[in-house]
Amino acid sequence: MGLRKIIRKALYNLKYTKKKSNSVSGKNFLITGASSGIGLSLTKSLISNNNVIGVYNSNKSNLDNIQSNNLISVKCDFRNYSDFENLNKVISEEKIDVIINCAGTFGSNNQSLENIDFDNLISVFKINSISIIKILQLMEKNNSIRSLSKIVNISSDGGSIKLNNQGNAYIYRLTKSALNSISKNLSVDLYNKYKTEVVTIDPGNVKTGMNPKGFLDADKCSEYILSLVFDKKNDVHGKFINLQNKEIPW
């Protein structure tokens, strides 16, 4: 790593030196993308004092390493609608208080206009955007949605229409923009019906499998997410925010 990048990383992490306490307990979480990255960090952080349904795509090994009776692991490939039946069996039997939707993928490497792979676009759209609607539709049908107090959608400022001054990355941008639109819609519909709060969070430059050169540790990111969502001083419902609780334009 070059000196300039070391300095940039150090300056970036200075914003996140404050320790955030995790006092969340006694709740029932559904976490998508739970087998890696931010989803895995959240699962590990919450599992000792809460129940977690960890939804994974294919690789379960990281969840298997968590030794806890509070964890239910469920395989669901969001690209395959028949897989949602696995999830439906669980959510119809388990109470869910909070959904943290971390599942996401960047898509193919070259996403310039002339190189868009439309099969890949549809696959990424199913993962990044449609999956949360499908989960909530299942919960609506089996009436378990009534217990849902919070939905947290992990998005990206790459989905912000107003902030887009770079172009490119068509697949990633449009699927995250769609997720943002879905979040805003849910914040109206579900709050009116069930008082369910919905927040959309851009975690920033986090080091994950999708972003191996990221600056911020996933555990530190998870710490800030939980503080944002569960600190009663924070009014985050219906907003698109970063980890510093600053609003991002849609």
Residue locations for each model-derived region?
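Structural signature of the Rossmann-like NAD(P)-dependent dehydrogenase/reductase core
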Residues: I31-T32, N101-C102, S149-S156, E197-D202
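Non-catalytic terminal and boundary segments that flank Rossmann-like NAD(P)-dependent oxidoreductase
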Residues: M1-N28, K89-I91
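N-terminal Rossmann NAD(P)H-binding glycine-rich loop of SDR-like oxidoreductase domains
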Residues: S35-K44
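Catalytic loop of short-chain dehydrogenase/reductase
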Residues: T105, N109-F125, L148-N192
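Conserved glycine-rich Rossmann-like NAD(P)H-binding loop of the short-chain dehydrogenase/reductase
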Residues: N49-L63
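C-terminal helical subdomain
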Residues: T196, T200-P203, P212-W250
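Rossmann-fold cofactor-recognition segment
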Residues: Q67-S82
